[in-house]
């Protein structure tokens, strides 16, 4: 058993910063006090928040590790204050049964710097074959990277999903709608027109009608996409638009929208109308992005997600509590994982922030295998220290640990 010790400083607790001494034992929070008494103490200057969770990453292991692997992807995560990631199942060989799930888990082995969970892909009729350790299921209603559209989920699968209490994340673009809008694409505006907001709205209507307990509409790109589900949004849809000179490095699914839609989306996020902020980190090689019409969709973002919004919070553009709720507290809570809160029994995962240390994002300082970021040059505040389960993994802006991330399976019903 590890000896108790205390992490001391100004913690974000109860919606405000307050000096606390948080006792850590065996990687978990064991006490929250003004004075922890006679235990070893580590004091941190700056602001201390619980570390973040990203429920939507594509680290490409196995099958496409020339683009990214769990080592490089998870290292990027912890540099950005994210100690827990959930990896999507659209690998080169999609994770559609328990054998594929086991192979993927085995290929990650001990390479992750962050704690992690894995999704399985629901094809509409394969729920009986899925690994019970899956943190949740992903349904691609419209085709995207390494996936084809699933237009209908069979009733038997819906019953099994609810029986197993799987949260289901939907790629919310209707395949039928996408097919009717296919066109030659030369730029971001064309990509927007080829995958219009109407395709998301059509998918949202279908998802709203599904009798599934926990439904999440992924990467919502327009404030008009609403319904009976939780809503996830990404930094790229909040901060970028199809009028920016990003070329194929701004090509994503769903597409970046026009500036008016983007600004309305950001206003909704600022107003607290979204549940989750995720990166949808989806790296590709430079060859994959070379020619717009044939370029693959996806950008990097796991390292910059939280730092971008810490900078916006410091500028009083985004309320800190909105960032806390959508990037830190809600994501693990929705999946039943005890992270993201300063509460006894929760993992001792923290990030230390110097709000006066604002920097511009520099591709050359990012840790993805292909660090070409559409946010290059934007203001960000990166954590000076990151602590995962009581262990310091980033110290004075540098990683100091070997990979120590652990696999977190879906909590089983008692």
From Swiss-Prot:
Pathway terms, separated by semicolons: Pyrimidine metabolism; UMP biosynthesis via de novo pathway; (S)-dihydroorotate from bicarbonate: step 3/3
Cofactor note: Binds 2 Zn(2+) ions per subunit.
Residues annotated for Zn(2+) 1 binding in this entry: 56, 58, 138, 280
Binding-site positions, Zn(2+) 2: 138, 171, 219
Active site residues per record: 280
S-S pairs: none
GO CC list: cytoplasm
Domain of life: Archaea
Catalytic activity: (S)-dihydroorotate + H2O = N-carbamoyl-L-aspartate + H(+)
PTM sites of type N6-carboxylysine: 138
GO biological process, one term: purine nucleobase catabolic process
The keyword Hydrolase appears for this protein: yes
GO MF, any single term: zinc ion binding
Pfam family, one: Amidohydro_1
Known EC number: 3.5.2.3
Cofactor: Zn(2+)
UniProt binding sites for substrate: 58-60, 90, 284
Keywords, sorted A to Z: Hydrolase, Metal-binding, Pyrimidine biosynthesis, Zinc
Functional note: Catalyzes the reversible cyclization of carbamoyl aspartate to dihydroorotate.
Family named by the database record: Belongs to the metallo-dependent hydrolases superfamily. DHOase family. Class I DHOase subfamily.
Protein name (database record): Dihydroorotase
Protein's gene: pyrC
